[in-house]
């Protein structure tokens, strides 16, 4: 595991596949996940390396082994998209394929809209059919992350996110801040 800096935050990432590959891909995970759970454990590192691509997977700010600010302003879509480009710059990668899952898809879409000239191909998965709908109930995810116990959470979807965050030993206050940020 290595780190790079974006907006003054230390963000963790893995590099895999041939270092001299002509093409690179950046993987961006979903909310309350991390690079290991979303990508490595599921076999993506090996599959990408087998295709001869140089791969990178970061832990988004507030997740995994990356910095975990508790300020919602640190989690704008634009800031998280800058993290993708900061990783590419750190690695000396001018252009890359970009694959995002769930929240990572929102980040990837923002990155592509910000600087499409640096993105070879964009793949978004787990986006959901409501990507263009108005935001859900304001603060519901944050409240689930801040609840003293999962039993205090009534909505099944929110309870499942809380259980997943607890299983991954994530910083729930950072996740609450992330959910309050302008990320979706």
Predicted features along the sequence, with ranges:
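Conserved alpha/beta-hydrolase "nucleophile elbow" surrounding the catalytic nucleophile
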Residues: 29, 96, 100-105
